[in-house]
């Protein structure tokens, strides 16, 4: 979202990603729905930009096993989509350099599971 619609953290996130050059960006395939819908209120151009951006990011499909893992993740306040993103991140194991996120519940849950987290500001 922050790479599609300008928010206070957008420039910091862009700098962070440039500095991390050479590392692959990956996300859950659910971002194919989540991101365009999140920016839809900003108009068709934002939706098109989101779709184009997602085409440059690796996406891991949500298998039934992954969804079951997400259902079992705590804490209880973790929202469903965030649980899927977190389960997706866990699938990368030691290859995961960092989970970049700005949702407090998601980043706290990731930290509790021992995942590296960044929220560039």
Where does each model-flagged region fall?
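Short, well-structured N-terminal submotif of metal-dependent ribonuclease cores
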Residues: 1-27, 39-51, 55, 121
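Residue-level recognition of oxygen-bearing side chains
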Residues: 9, 65, 105
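Phosphate- and divalent-cation-binding pockets in alpha/beta enzyme and binding domains
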Residues: 12, 34, 69, 108-109
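Acidic, PIN/NYN-like endoribonuclease modules and their adjacent C-terminal/linker elements
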Residues: 27-28, 32, 41, 60, ...
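Acidic catalytic patch
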Residues: 55-76, 82-88
